[in-house]
Amino acid sequence: MNELELKYGCNPNQKPSRIYMEDGSDLPVTVLNGKPGYINFLDAFNGWQLVSNLKKATGLPAATSFKHVSPAGAAVGLPLTETLAKIYWVNDMDWKNFSPLACAYARARGADRMSSFGDFISLSDVCDKDTALLIKREVSDGVIAPGYTEEALEILKQKKKGNYNVIQIDENFVPAPLEHKEVFGVTFEQGRQELEIDDAMLSNIVTENKELTEEAKRDMKISLIILKYTQSNSVCFVKDGQAIGVGAGQQSRVHCTRLAGQKADNWFLRQCPKVLNLPFKDTISRAERDNAIDVYIGDEYMDVLADGMWEKTFTEKPEVFTKEEKRAWLDQMTDVTLGSDAFFPFSDNIERAHKSGVKYIAQPGGSVRDDAVIETCNKYGMVMSFTGIRLFHH
Protein backbone atom coordinates (compact mmCIF):
# COMPACT_ATOMS: atom_id res chain seq x y z
CA MET A 1 0.00 0.00 0.00
CA ASN A 2 1.58 3.29 -1.08
CA GLU A 3 -0.97 5.70 0.42
CA LEU A 4 -3.20 6.02 3.45
CA GLU A 5 -6.18 8.36 3.58
CA LEU A 6 -6.52 10.36 6.79
CA LYS A 7 -9.60 11.89 8.39
CA TYR A 8 -8.16 15.42 8.09
CA GLY A 9 -4.88 17.35 8.29
CA CYS A 10 -3.67 19.49 11.21
CA ASN A 11 -7.24 20.72 11.78
CA PRO A 12 -10.69 19.30 10.97
CA ASN A 13 -11.24 21.86 8.18
CA GLN A 14 -8.08 20.79 6.33
CA LYS A 15 -9.36 18.15 3.91
CA PRO A 16 -8.54 15.99 2.08
CA SER A 17 -5.56 14.50 3.87
CA ARG A 18 -3.29 11.51 3.27
CA ILE A 19 0.22 10.16 3.58
CA TYR A 20 1.74 8.56 0.49
CA MET A 21 4.94 7.57 -1.28
CA GLU A 22 5.72 9.78 -4.29
CA ASP A 23 7.76 7.06 -5.99
CA GLY A 24 4.87 4.60 -5.84
CA SER A 25 6.61 2.26 -3.40
CA ASP A 26 4.89 0.81 -0.34
CA LEU A 27 4.59 2.87 2.83
CA PRO A 28 7.08 1.73 5.50
CA VAL A 29 4.28 1.50 8.07
CA THR A 30 1.30 -0.75 8.75
CA VAL A 31 -1.60 0.34 10.94
CA LEU A 32 -2.37 -2.62 13.21
CA ASN A 33 -5.15 -0.88 15.14
CA GLY A 34 -7.02 2.42 15.21
CA LYS A 35 -7.00 5.29 12.71
CA PRO A 36 -3.94 7.50 13.25
CA GLY A 37 -4.23 11.13 12.21
CA TYR A 38 -1.98 13.64 10.47
CA ILE A 39 -0.28 14.92 13.65
CA ASN A 40 -0.03 11.35 14.99
CA PHE A 41 2.09 10.41 11.98
CA LEU A 42 4.25 13.54 12.31
CA ASP A 43 4.94 12.55 15.92
CA ALA A 44 5.44 8.90 14.97
CA PHE A 45 7.99 9.48 12.20
CA ASN A 46 9.98 12.05 14.18
CA GLY A 47 9.85 9.92 17.32
CA TRP A 48 10.91 6.78 15.48
CA GLN A 49 14.00 8.52 14.12
CA LEU A 50 14.85 9.75 17.62
CA VAL A 51 14.63 6.34 19.32
CA SER A 52 16.45 4.64 16.44
CA ASN A 53 19.29 7.13 16.85
CA LEU A 54 19.36 6.63 20.63
CA LYS A 55 19.52 2.85 20.25
CA LYS A 56 22.36 3.13 17.73
CA ALA A 57 24.33 5.60 19.87
CA THR A 58 23.96 3.80 23.22
CA GLY A 59 23.16 0.18 22.40
CA LEU A 60 20.18 0.39 24.75
CA PRO A 61 16.44 0.16 24.04
CA ALA A 62 14.93 3.63 23.82
CA ALA A 63 11.54 5.31 24.07
CA THR A 64 10.18 8.78 23.55
CA SER A 65 6.96 10.57 24.41
CA PHE A 66 5.97 13.10 21.73
CA LYS A 67 3.46 15.95 21.76
CA HIS A 68 2.97 18.34 18.82
CA VAL A 69 6.08 17.18 16.96
CA SER A 70 8.51 17.63 19.86
CA PRO A 71 9.55 15.19 22.58
CA ALA A 72 8.21 15.81 26.07
CA GLY A 73 10.60 13.11 27.22
CA ALA A 74 12.99 10.48 25.91
CA ALA A 75 15.15 7.87 27.60
CA VAL A 76 17.18 4.71 27.27
CA GLY A 77 16.40 1.54 29.18
CA LEU A 78 18.29 1.90 32.43
CA PRO A 79 16.78 0.35 35.60
CA LEU A 80 14.51 2.47 37.76
CA THR A 81 15.22 3.47 41.34
CA GLU A 82 12.53 3.23 44.00
CA THR A 83 12.17 7.01 44.04
CA LEU A 84 11.77 7.20 40.27
CA ALA A 85 9.22 4.39 40.37
CA LYS A 86 7.22 6.48 42.84
CA ILE A 87 7.29 9.76 40.92
CA TYR A 88 6.50 7.95 37.65
CA TRP A 89 3.50 6.24 39.33
CA VAL A 90 4.71 2.71 38.57
CA ASN A 91 5.56 1.68 42.14
CA ASP A 92 2.32 -0.34 42.27
CA MET A 93 3.62 -2.47 39.38
CA ASP A 94 6.42 -5.06 39.27
CA TRP A 95 8.85 -2.27 38.36
CA LYS A 96 11.97 -4.04 39.67
CA ASN A 97 11.48 -6.65 36.94
CA PHE A 98 10.53 -4.28 34.12
CA SER A 99 12.12 -5.01 30.75
CA PRO A 100 14.68 -2.41 29.60
CA LEU A 101 12.15 -1.12 27.06
CA ALA A 102 9.50 -0.64 29.76
CA CYS A 103 12.07 1.21 31.89
CA ALA A 104 12.81 3.45 28.92
CA TYR A 105 9.15 4.37 28.47
CA ALA A 106 8.56 4.84 32.20
CA ARG A 107 11.43 7.34 32.18
CA ALA A 108 10.35 9.04 28.95
CA ARG A 109 6.76 9.44 30.13
CA GLY A 110 7.73 10.31 33.69
CA ALA A 111 10.11 13.19 33.02
CA ASP A 112 7.37 15.73 32.26
CA ARG A 113 4.07 13.99 32.92
CA MET A 114 2.06 17.18 32.46
CA SER A 115 3.31 17.58 28.89
CA SER A 116 3.16 13.85 28.10
CA PHE A 117 -0.58 13.61 28.79
CA GLY A 118 -2.07 12.34 25.50
CA ASP A 119 1.32 11.56 23.97
CA PHE A 120 2.36 9.57 20.92
CA ILE A 121 4.93 6.93 21.85
CA SER A 122 7.89 5.68 19.83
CA LEU A 123 9.78 2.51 20.79
CA SER A 124 13.11 1.36 19.37
CA ASP A 125 12.45 -2.33 19.97
CA VAL A 126 9.61 -4.83 19.68
CA CYS A 127 6.94 -3.83 22.20
CA ASP A 128 6.75 -6.44 24.96
CA LYS A 129 4.11 -7.22 27.58
CA ASP A 130 5.75 -5.06 30.28
CA THR A 131 5.78 -2.01 28.04
CA ALA A 132 2.24 -2.62 26.79
CA LEU A 133 0.90 -2.86 30.36
CA LEU A 134 2.64 0.41 31.18
CA ILE A 135 1.18 2.11 28.10
CA LYS A 136 -2.28 0.69 28.78
CA ARG A 137 -2.70 2.69 32.00
CA GLU A 138 -1.63 6.05 30.54
CA VAL A 139 -3.63 8.58 28.50
CA SER A 140 -1.99 8.28 25.09
CA ASP A 141 -2.89 8.70 21.42
CA GLY A 142 -0.83 5.87 19.99
CA VAL A 143 2.44 4.02 19.58
CA ILE A 144 4.90 3.15 16.81
CA ALA A 145 7.39 0.28 17.08
CA PRO A 146 9.19 -2.18 14.79
CA GLY A 147 6.96 -4.96 16.11
CA TYR A 148 4.73 -6.19 18.91
CA THR A 149 4.56 -9.49 20.73
CA GLU A 150 1.19 -11.18 20.38
CA GLU A 151 0.45 -10.53 24.05
CA ALA A 152 1.46 -6.86 23.84
CA LEU A 153 -0.70 -6.24 20.77
CA GLU A 154 -3.78 -7.72 22.43
CA ILE A 155 -3.23 -5.50 25.48
CA LEU A 156 -2.88 -2.35 23.36
CA LYS A 157 -5.94 -3.18 21.26
CA GLN A 158 -8.04 -2.91 24.43
CA LYS A 159 -7.16 0.78 24.93
CA LYS A 160 -9.60 3.58 24.05
CA LYS A 161 -12.47 1.12 23.58
CA GLY A 162 -10.51 -0.68 20.89
CA ASN A 163 -9.52 2.48 19.00
CA TYR A 164 -5.95 2.95 20.25
CA ASN A 165 -3.54 3.71 17.40
CA VAL A 166 -0.91 1.01 16.92
CA ILE A 167 1.60 1.41 14.07
CA GLN A 168 4.30 -1.01 12.99
CA ILE A 169 7.26 0.40 11.07
CA ASP A 170 9.75 -1.38 8.86
CA GLU A 171 12.96 -0.89 10.84
CA ASN A 172 15.03 -1.47 7.70
CA PHE A 173 13.38 1.35 5.75
CA VAL A 174 15.84 3.99 4.51
CA PRO A 175 14.31 7.24 3.16
CA ALA A 176 15.60 8.99 0.06
CA PRO A 177 18.60 11.29 0.66
CA LEU A 178 16.58 14.35 -0.38
CA GLU A 179 13.42 15.48 1.41
CA HIS A 180 10.74 17.92 0.28
CA LYS A 181 8.27 20.18 2.06
CA GLU A 182 5.67 22.48 0.56
CA VAL A 183 4.75 25.83 2.12
CA PHE A 184 2.35 28.29 0.47
CA GLY A 185 2.58 26.43 -2.80
CA VAL A 186 6.38 26.55 -2.84
CA THR A 187 8.41 23.34 -2.57
CA PHE A 188 11.50 23.28 -0.36
CA GLU A 189 14.21 20.67 -0.90
CA GLN A 190 17.08 19.73 1.39
CA GLY A 191 19.33 16.82 2.22
CA ARG A 192 18.02 14.67 5.04
CA GLN A 193 19.51 15.20 8.50
CA GLU A 194 21.69 12.09 8.57
CA LEU A 195 24.34 13.35 10.98
CA GLU A 196 25.45 10.68 13.45
CA ILE A 197 25.99 11.80 17.03
CA ASP A 198 29.08 10.06 18.42
CA ASP A 199 31.94 10.49 20.89
CA ALA A 200 34.11 12.26 18.31
CA MET A 201 31.65 15.13 18.27
CA LEU A 202 32.39 15.76 21.96
CA SER A 203 36.19 15.85 21.66
CA ASN A 204 36.64 19.64 21.41
CA ILE A 205 36.49 20.50 25.10
CA VAL A 206 37.00 24.25 25.51
CA THR A 207 36.82 24.59 29.30
CA GLU A 208 39.54 24.24 31.93
CA ASN A 209 37.81 21.16 33.31
CA LYS A 210 38.15 18.46 30.66
CA GLU A 211 37.08 15.40 32.65
CA LEU A 212 34.23 13.65 30.83
CA THR A 213 32.95 10.45 32.41
CA GLU A 214 31.45 7.71 30.24
CA GLU A 215 28.06 8.52 31.76
CA ALA A 216 28.50 12.17 30.85
CA LYS A 217 29.38 11.26 27.25
CA ARG A 218 26.29 9.07 27.05
CA ASP A 219 24.06 11.84 28.39
CA MET A 220 25.60 14.44 26.07
CA LYS A 221 24.88 12.23 23.07
CA ILE A 222 21.34 11.65 24.30
CA SER A 223 20.76 15.39 24.67
CA LEU A 224 22.00 16.10 21.14
CA ILE A 225 19.94 13.30 19.59
CA ILE A 226 16.83 14.60 21.34
CA LEU A 227 17.54 18.11 20.03
CA LYS A 228 17.97 16.72 16.52
CA TYR A 229 14.22 15.97 16.50
CA THR A 230 12.92 18.87 18.64
CA GLN A 231 11.37 22.03 17.19
CA SER A 232 13.92 24.87 17.39
CA ASN A 233 15.12 26.79 19.25
CA SER A 234 15.64 23.97 21.71
CA VAL A 235 17.60 23.07 24.83
CA CYS A 236 17.60 19.74 26.65
CA PHE A 237 18.60 18.76 30.20
CA VAL A 238 19.58 15.10 30.66
CA LYS A 239 20.48 13.01 33.70
CA ASP A 240 21.10 9.28 34.06
CA GLY A 241 20.11 8.39 30.52
CA GLN A 242 16.91 10.39 30.26
CA ALA A 243 15.66 13.85 29.41
CA ILE A 244 14.52 15.68 32.52
CA GLY A 245 13.60 18.95 30.80
CA VAL A 246 13.06 19.89 27.16
CA GLY A 247 12.64 23.53 26.14
CA ALA A 248 11.28 23.54 22.59
CA GLY A 249 10.16 26.05 20.00
CA GLN A 250 11.26 29.26 21.71
CA GLN A 251 12.54 32.29 19.79
CA SER A 252 14.99 33.23 22.57
CA ARG A 253 17.80 30.89 23.61
CA VAL A 254 17.65 31.87 27.27
CA HIS A 255 13.90 31.28 27.33
CA CYS A 256 14.63 27.74 26.08
CA THR A 257 17.09 27.30 28.93
CA ARG A 258 14.68 28.71 31.51
CA LEU A 259 11.83 26.53 30.28
CA ALA A 260 13.91 23.35 30.19
CA GLY A 261 15.54 24.28 33.50
CA GLN A 262 12.19 24.74 35.22
CA LYS A 263 11.03 21.35 33.93
CA ALA A 264 14.26 19.79 35.23
CA ASP A 265 13.74 21.50 38.59
CA ASN A 266 10.19 20.17 38.77
CA TRP A 267 11.46 16.66 38.01
CA PHE A 268 13.86 16.87 40.95
CA LEU A 269 11.42 18.60 43.31
CA ARG A 270 8.98 15.74 42.77
CA GLN A 271 11.59 13.48 44.40
CA CYS A 272 11.67 15.49 47.63
CA PRO A 273 10.13 13.56 50.57
CA LYS A 274 7.79 16.49 51.20
CA VAL A 275 6.26 15.92 47.75
CA LEU A 276 6.54 12.12 47.74
CA ASN A 277 4.54 11.99 50.97
CA LEU A 278 1.69 14.31 49.98
CA PRO A 279 -1.51 12.85 51.53
CA PHE A 280 -3.61 12.32 48.41
CA LYS A 281 -7.10 10.94 48.65
CA ASP A 282 -7.42 7.41 47.26
CA THR A 283 -9.95 8.66 44.70
CA ILE A 284 -7.50 11.09 43.07
CA SER A 285 -6.21 9.80 39.71
CA ARG A 286 -2.58 9.87 38.60
CA ALA A 287 -3.27 12.72 36.17
CA GLU A 288 -5.00 14.73 38.91
CA ARG A 289 -2.05 14.09 41.22
CA ASP A 290 0.33 15.31 38.52
CA ASN A 291 -1.68 18.52 38.20
CA ALA A 292 -1.81 19.04 41.96
CA ILE A 293 1.92 18.45 42.37
CA ASP A 294 2.70 20.86 39.54
CA VAL A 295 0.77 23.59 41.35
CA TYR A 296 2.08 22.64 44.81
CA ILE A 297 5.75 22.97 43.83
CA GLY A 298 5.13 26.17 41.87
CA ASP A 299 4.47 29.78 42.82
CA GLU A 300 0.68 29.38 42.80
CA TYR A 301 0.68 26.75 45.55
CA MET A 302 -2.24 28.38 47.38
CA ASP A 303 -4.47 27.28 44.49
CA VAL A 304 -4.34 23.80 46.03
CA LEU A 305 -3.65 24.70 49.67
CA ALA A 306 -6.30 27.35 50.33
CA ASP A 307 -9.12 26.40 52.67
CA GLY A 308 -11.95 24.99 50.61
CA MET A 309 -9.46 23.76 47.97
CA TRP A 310 -7.08 21.34 49.68
CA GLU A 311 -10.00 19.23 50.89
CA LYS A 312 -10.78 18.25 47.28
CA THR A 313 -7.40 16.56 46.82
CA PHE A 314 -5.80 15.72 50.17
CA THR A 315 -6.85 13.90 53.34
CA GLU A 316 -5.15 16.60 55.40
CA LYS A 317 -3.74 20.02 54.60
CA PRO A 318 -0.09 19.81 53.45
CA GLU A 319 2.50 22.26 54.68
CA VAL A 320 3.70 24.94 52.29
CA PHE A 321 6.82 23.91 50.35
CA THR A 322 8.76 27.11 50.97
CA LYS A 323 11.07 28.82 48.50
CA GLU A 324 13.98 28.21 50.87
CA GLU A 325 13.17 24.50 51.18
CA LYS A 326 12.93 24.13 47.43
CA ARG A 327 16.25 25.88 46.86
CA ALA A 328 17.95 23.72 49.48
CA TRP A 329 16.64 20.58 47.77
CA LEU A 330 17.59 21.76 44.27
CA ASP A 331 21.12 22.52 45.46
CA GLN A 332 21.56 18.75 45.83
CA MET A 333 20.99 18.14 42.10
CA THR A 334 24.35 17.51 40.42
CA ASP A 335 25.99 16.10 37.28
CA VAL A 336 23.22 17.23 34.94
CA THR A 337 23.99 17.49 31.22
CA LEU A 338 22.77 20.32 29.00
CA GLY A 339 22.58 20.24 25.21
CA SER A 340 21.70 23.15 22.92
CA ASP A 341 20.78 23.00 19.22
CA ALA A 342 22.68 26.26 18.54
CA PHE A 343 25.28 28.41 20.29
CA PHE A 344 24.67 30.30 23.51
CA PRO A 345 24.79 34.02 22.63
CA PHE A 346 25.13 35.15 26.27
CA SER A 347 26.44 33.68 29.51
CA ASP A 348 23.03 34.12 31.19
CA ASN A 349 22.18 30.66 29.86
CA ILE A 350 25.08 29.19 31.83
CA GLU A 351 24.07 31.03 35.00
CA ARG A 352 20.56 29.57 34.69
CA ALA A 353 21.90 26.10 33.92
CA HIS A 354 24.08 26.19 37.05
CA LYS A 355 20.95 26.64 39.20
CA SER A 356 19.72 23.27 37.94
CA GLY A 357 22.89 21.34 38.68
CA VAL A 358 24.40 21.36 35.19
CA LYS A 359 28.01 20.16 35.01
CA TYR A 360 28.31 19.07 31.37
CA ILE A 361 27.39 21.10 28.28
CA ALA A 362 27.33 20.26 24.57
CA GLN A 363 26.72 23.10 22.12
CA PRO A 364 27.98 24.12 18.67
CA GLY A 365 29.98 27.18 19.72
CA GLY A 366 30.50 30.04 17.29
CA SER A 367 29.08 33.00 19.21
CA VAL A 368 31.00 36.28 19.27
CA ARG A 369 30.68 35.95 23.06
CA ASP A 370 32.06 32.41 23.32
CA ASP A 371 34.83 33.70 25.62
CA ALA A 372 32.29 35.00 28.15
CA VAL A 373 30.33 31.74 28.00
CA ILE A 374 33.52 29.70 28.55
CA GLU A 375 34.56 31.98 31.41
CA THR A 376 31.23 31.41 33.16
CA CYS A 377 31.56 27.65 32.70
CA ASN A 378 35.04 27.80 34.22
CA LYS A 379 33.67 29.75 37.18
CA TYR A 380 31.44 26.78 38.02
CA GLY A 381 33.87 24.01 37.07
CA MET A 382 31.72 22.84 34.16
CA VAL A 383 32.90 20.78 31.21
CA MET A 384 31.81 22.16 27.83
CA SER A 385 32.29 20.65 24.38
CA PHE A 386 31.97 22.64 21.18
CA THR A 387 30.46 20.25 18.65
CA GLY A 388 30.69 22.63 15.70
CA ILE A 389 27.32 21.33 14.51
CA ARG A 390 23.98 23.15 14.57
CA LEU A 391 20.89 20.99 15.03
CA PHE A 392 17.92 23.14 13.99
CA HIS A 393 14.73 21.24 13.26
CA HIS A 394 11.59 22.68 11.64
Predicted regions and their residues:
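Active-site loops and adjacent core secondary-structure elements that bind or stabilize anionic groups
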Residues: M1-M201, A216-S234
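Flexible, glycine/charged-enriched surface loops at secondary-structure junctions
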Residues: A57-S65, V166-I169, S232-K239, L269-F280, ...
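Active-site-proximal loop/turn and secondary-structure-junction residues that shape catalytic pockets
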Residues: S70, C127, K239-Q242, Q250, ...
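Gly-rich Lys/Arg/Thr-decorated short loops/hinges at beta-loop-alpha junctions or inter-strand turns
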Residues: D23-K35, A111-F117, Q193-K210, A287-M309, ...
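Glycine- and Gly-Pro-enriched alpha-helical subdomains that act as flexible
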Residues: A72-R113, I244-F343
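Conserved helix-loop functional segments at active or binding sites
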Residues: N53, Y229, N266-R270, K355, ...
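Substrate-contacting helices/loops that form the catalytic groove of nucleic-acid
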Residues: P177-L212, R270-D282, R286-N291
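C-terminal binding/interaction regions
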Residues: D119, L123-S124, R137-I167, N172-V174, ...
